[in-house]
From Swiss-Prot:
Protein purpose: Required for rescue of stalled ribosomes mediated by trans-translation. Binds to transfer-messenger RNA (tmRNA), required for stable association of tmRNA with ribosomes. tmRNA and SmpB together mimic tRNA shape, replacing the anticodon stem-loop with SmpB. tmRNA is encoded by the ssrA gene; the 2 termini fold to resemble tRNA(Ala) and it encodes a 'tag peptide', a short internal open reading frame. During trans-translation Ala-aminoacylated tmRNA acts like a tRNA, entering the A-site of stalled ribosomes, displacing the stalled mRNA.
Record's protein name: SsrA-binding protein
Subcellular location: Cytoplasm
Bias (Basic and acidic residues): 136-158
Gene3D superfamilies the UniProt entry points to: 2.40.280.10
Region of interest (Disordered), ranges: 132-158
PANTHER family the UniProt entry points to: SSRA-BINDING PROTEIN, TMRNA-BINDING COMPONENT OF TRANS-TRANSLATION TAGGING COMPLEX
Amino acid sequence: MNKPKNSPVRKIIAENRKARFNFEILDTLEAGLVLTGTEVKSLRANQSNIAESYASFENGEFWLINSYIPEYTQGNRFNHEPRRLRKLLISKREMSRLFNSVSRDGMTVVPLKLYFNDRGRAKLELALARGKKTHDKRETEKKRDWNREKARLMRDKG
C-alpha cells in the first residue's frame, strides 16, 4: 500500500529535548545545513547530538556551533572534524528577522530537531527562544503534572 502523497516523511536523527524545558519557544523555522559527504553518511547512521548546540550570527551568516556529528567509521583521511562550525542555509528575510530579535530582545536561536526531509536533505528545525528562569521551569513542571493528574482522574472516572 502506497503512502499518501501529501504526508511529509521526516526521519528524525537528533532531538534537543532539553530546549523545550530550558527555553520558552516563541517561533520555529526550518534551515538547511552545509555538510560534507562523511557527515551525511554519519547522520544516516543515526549518530549526532545537538543538545549543547546553538546558532550564532557571524560575518553576515548564521552558523551552528557545538553540534556533534561523529566521524564516519568507514571514512578515510578525508573525514570531517566532529565539532566544526556548520553553516545554516536561511533566506535573507528570515536571517534579518532572527538577527534583529537576537540583538534587540535578548533572545537566542536554538536547534530543536535534526532530520532528513522527504527529499533526503538534512534539515534543522530552529527555534527563536527566550531563556527561562528557575521559577518559570518550576511553574511549567507544575502545569504539566497537573494536566497529567487531570487526565488520570478523567480516565479513572469515565
